[in-house]
């Protein structure tokens, strides 16, 4: 069967757009961990004149850490096109007090990173976080396809520390309007380590549109009791709980306020 040249060109263009939106998102997504807990995070930038970067993750992940610092797994692109893992320590507390901004109601935290990172990193513009108007315009809803980037059970895609890409669908209805229900269900198997991972779809001009953040999984717990044994069995339901991006936006704005918690200043060399 012969395929018309214009169809071939269209398919090539579509493939390029898909690669672009996913690559832009993965370049801004990083593992965040300490000896006690591992999660996923991503970097957002606000419009000028704000030059800081905003690290987004689930608050329960940061609350589970034990020290005043955590490790952000960065990646350095080498001249031959390969990547090298670069673990970078960031402050998350000062004298035991949190440095992150948190939402009043939701499990999301944002750290404002004012100091430059040791290697160039990808970031996602604040405008890519979908508010209610953007969701309405996109016409996504029940069974719409979505993508996630996470570190399930701390697993990395390769030695450079890239996250794992997966796909699912929106599994609950209605998605809108935003109101008392700040989250929705997604049909993909969630694991520990996924929390803080971006949930996204293709946006305008081949750019990613973030429609939420993974923060929980669902499972069925069963208690087994007999005369000589008592144990619990956890059955995964193959569902993740996703916080709407609107509430990530609100938390970033909290982190950007002058009175928000600030990390300690670096000592002069």
In which residue ranges do the predicted regions lie?
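Serine endopeptidase catalytic core focused on the charge-relay Asp
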Residues: 26-38, 47, 63-179, 187-188, ...
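C-terminal cap/linker of serine protease catalytic domains
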Residues: 209-269
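Catalytic nucleophile loop of clan PA
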Residues: 185-214
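Residues located in well-ordered beta-strands
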Residues: 40-42, 169, 198
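Cytochrome P450 catalytic-core helices
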Residues: 57
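Protease-domain processing segments flanking chymotrypsin-fold serine proteases, especially trypsin-like
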Residues: 12-52, 266-269
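Bacterial N-terminal signal peptides that target proteins for export
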Residues: 1-7
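Histidine-centered active-site/metal-ligand motif
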Residues: 60
């Amino acid at each position: 069967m012969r395929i018309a040249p214009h169809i071939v060109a269209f398919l090539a263009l579509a493939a390029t757009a898909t690669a672009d939106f996913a690559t832009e998102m993965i370049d801004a997504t990083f593992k965040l961990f300490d000896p006690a807990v591992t999660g996923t995070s991503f970097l957002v930038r606000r419009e000028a004149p704000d030059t800081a970067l905003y690290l987004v993750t689930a608050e329960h992940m940061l609350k589970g850490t034990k020290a005043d610092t955590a490790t952000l797994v960065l990646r350095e692109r080498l001249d031959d096109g390969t990547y090298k893992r670069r673990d970078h320590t960031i402050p998350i507390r000062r004298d035991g007090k949190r440095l992150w901004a948190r939402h009043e109601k939701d499990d999301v935290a944002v750290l404002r990173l004012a100091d430059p990172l040791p290697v160039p990193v990808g970031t996602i513009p604040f405008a890519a976080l979908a508010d209610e108007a953007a969701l309405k315009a996109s016409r996504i809803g029940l069974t719409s396809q979505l993508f996630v980037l996470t570190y399930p059970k701390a697993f990395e895609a390769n030695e450079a520390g890239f996250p794992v890409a997966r796909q699912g669908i929106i599994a609950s209805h209605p998605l809108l309007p935003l109101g008392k229900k700040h989250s929705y269900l997604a049909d993909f198997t969630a694991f520990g380590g996924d929390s803080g991972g971006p949930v996204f779809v293709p946006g305008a001009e081949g750019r990613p549109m973030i429609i939420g953040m993974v923060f929980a999984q669902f499972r069925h717990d069963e208690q087994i009791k007999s005369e000589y044994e008592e144990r619990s069995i956890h059955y995964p339901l193959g569902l993740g709980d996703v916080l709407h991006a609107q509430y990530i936006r609100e938390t970033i704005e909290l982190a950007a306020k002058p009175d928000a918690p600030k990390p300690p200043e670096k000592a002069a060399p």
